[in-house]
Amino acid sequence: MAFSLCWKAPRSQWSFLQALNSGFPLFPWRTVGSCLDLKMKAYLEENTEVTSSGSLTPEIQLRLLTPRCKFWWERADLWPYSDPYWAIYWPGGQALSRYLLDNPDVVRGKSVLDLGSGCGATAIAAKMSGASNILANDVDPIAGMAITLNCKLNGLNPFPILTKNILNTRQGKFDLIVLGDMFYDEDLADSLHLWLQNCFWAYGTRVLIGDPGRPQFSGHSIQHQLYQLAEYTLPEPTQQDNNGLTTSAVWDFHP
């Protein structure tokens, strides 16, 4: 994503724009919303572009914010919904999705929780690779609508989507938890670490993490419990969109 944009405006006006420059900051947890709002659906379809290029997963079509979209250039305060983090295909999610598509045995026949699902690409990759049950989780109800639209783009029936903060709750058993680009804030990283450890110890849940090497991740104590499974060179457009980050990796969590 280029940042010589009119839409960028003063960065103080929209934390989303800071996200793109700093690598995805903390955003507020939100309450459950409807994924069936027709007005919202029409607005997202009008203001996003269907694309499968410029990422590690050309097999997956997604509705994203691109330079051909009005709000790439428009004033940020004119966007009527919560900050559209879901409208960017972040590099950690790209690596996770690529890994699942290339290694379908990891998810085939398994139950999967996609934590911080965003555009839903990793959940979609899991479904394409044969996962039996999927729950996509994101704190933003607008992401829920985006995930629903992206499922349909890829010929999939929408899977369950939970739009709330689940880090303070005890979740049911999943065979696999996947999360990408979630270690962007130190406090959140600590909460994630504890929550993921509890899932592993309580249920033996496998955890895969995608990250391009942000400082909050590479400098966190969780590194002592990770094993790298794969590393991918990011496509040039993704490198440009992420301040020159060149690779993204997938890690297996073993506390």
Swiss-Prot record:
It is an enzyme of class 2 (transferase). Its EC number is 2.1.1.-. GO terms for molecular function: heat shock protein binding; protein-lysine N-methyltransferase activity. Keywords: Cytoplasm, Methyltransferase, Mitochondrion, Transferase, Transit peptide. Its main location: cytoplasm. It catalyses: L-lysyl-[protein] + 3 S-adenosyl-L-methionine = N(6),N(6),N(6)-trimethyl-L-lysyl-[protein] + 3 S-adenosyl-L-homocysteine + 3 H(+). Residues 1-32 form a transit peptide. GO terms for cellular component: cytoplasm; mitochondrial matrix; protein-containing complex. It is found in: Cytoplasm; Mitochondrion matrix. CDD domains: AdoMet_MTases. One of its GO terms (biological process) is negative regulation of fatty acid beta-oxidation using acyl-CoA dehydrogenase. InterPro entries: Ribosomal_L11_MeTrfase_PrmA, SAM-dependent_MTases_sf. It holds the Pfam family PrmA. Protein-lysine methyltransferase that selectively trimethylates the flavoprotein ETFB in mitochondria. Thereby, may negatively regulate the function of ETFB in electron transfer from Acyl-CoA dehydrogenases to the main respiratory chain. Interacts with HSPD1; this protein may possibly be a methylation substrate. PANTHER family: ELECTRON TRANSFER FLAVOPROTEIN BETA SUBUNIT LYSINE METHYLTRANSFERASE. Belongs to the methyltransferase superfamily. ETFBKMT family. This is Electron transfer flavoprotein beta subunit lysine methyltransferase. It comes from Rattus norvegicus.
